[in-house]
Amino acid sequence: QTATQLLKVAHKYRPETKQEKKQRLLARAEKKAAXKGDVPTKRPPVLRAGVNTVTTLVENKKAQLVVIAHDVDPIELVVFLPALCRKMGVPYCIIKGKARLGRLVHRKTCTTVAFTQVNSEDKGALAKLVEA
């Protein structure tokens, strides 16, 4: 129930694929070549993936919600994260399937993801998920 809602919200914050990045940079290069002036695009709010990145985000209190996979193979990789999240006051949840998290960030599997910034329309949905 809440896992599907979480994945729905997370789906909006997927990082761009290789093709999307190529197209974005190509469009920007064409604009620059047409001498329209180069304006760097504002960075969209996006999911951050991986144990090291997520750990840093939690330590700096930048993460708003941490999602941990339950089937990480050497479990020691993520076993410290719930304690760290509790200590830093960051909400966390454990979800079934590292493959589901991997699919969000265009990889095979992914142990942890973290929400950093969230668009205003999803603030309520995220707050509900944190509450549950």
From Swiss-Prot:
<dbReference type="InterPro" id="IPR004037">
    <property type="entry name" value="Ribosomal_eL8-like_CS"/>
</dbReference>
<keyword id="KW-0963">Cytoplasm</keyword>
<dbReference type="InterPro" id="IPR018492">
    <property type="entry name" value="Ribosomal_eL8/Nhp2"/>
</dbReference>
<feature type="cross-link" description="Glycyl lysine isopeptide (Lys-Gly) (interchain with G-Cter in SUMO2)">
    <location>
        <position position="36"/>
    </location>
</feature>
<keyword id="KW-1017">Isopeptide bond</keyword>
<dbReference type="GO" id="GO:0022625">
    <property type="term" value="C:cytosolic large ribosomal subunit"/>
</dbReference>
<feature type="cross-link" description="Glycyl lysine isopeptide (Lys-Gly) (interchain with G-Cter in SUMO2); alternate">
    <location>
        <position position="8"/>
    </location>
</feature>
<dbReference type="InterPro" id="IPR004038">
    <property type="entry name" value="Ribosomal_eL8/eL30/eS12/Gad45"/>
</dbReference>
<dbReference type="InterPro" id="IPR050257">
    <property type="entry name" value="eL8/uL1-like"/>
</dbReference>
<feature type="modified residue" description="N6-acetyllysine; alternate">
    <location>
        <position position="8"/>
    </location>
</feature>
<dbReference type="InterPro" id="IPR001921">
    <property type="entry name" value="Ribosomal_eL8_euk"/>
</dbReference>
<dbReference type="Pfam" id="PF01248">
    <property type="entry name" value="Ribosomal_L7Ae"/>
</dbReference>
<comment type="similarity">
    <text>Belongs to the eukaryotic ribosomal protein eL8 family.</text>
</comment>
<keyword id="KW-0689">Ribosomal protein</keyword>
<dbReference type="GO" id="GO:0000470">
    <property type="term" value="P:maturation of LSU-rRNA"/>
</dbReference>
<protein>
    <recommendedName>
        <fullName>Large ribosomal subunit protein eL8</fullName>
    </recommendedName>
</protein>
<feature type="modified residue" description="N6-acetyllysine">
    <location>
        <position position="128"/>
    </location>
</feature>
<keyword id="KW-0832">Ubl conjugation</keyword>
<dbReference type="InterPro" id="IPR029064">
    <property type="entry name" value="Ribosomal_eL30-like_sf"/>
</dbReference>
<keyword id="KW-0007">Acetylation</keyword>
<dbReference type="GO" id="GO:0003723">
    <property type="term" value="F:RNA binding"/>
</dbReference>
<keyword id="KW-0687">Ribonucleoprotein</keyword>
<comment type="function">
    <text>Component of the large ribosomal subunit. The ribosome is a large ribonucleoprotein complex responsible for the synthesis of proteins in the cell.</text>
</comment>
<comment type="subunit">
    <text>Component of the large ribosomal subunit. Interacts with CRY1. Interacts with DICER1, AGO2, TARBP2, MOV10 and EIF6; they form a large RNA-induced silencing complex (RISC).</text>
</comment>
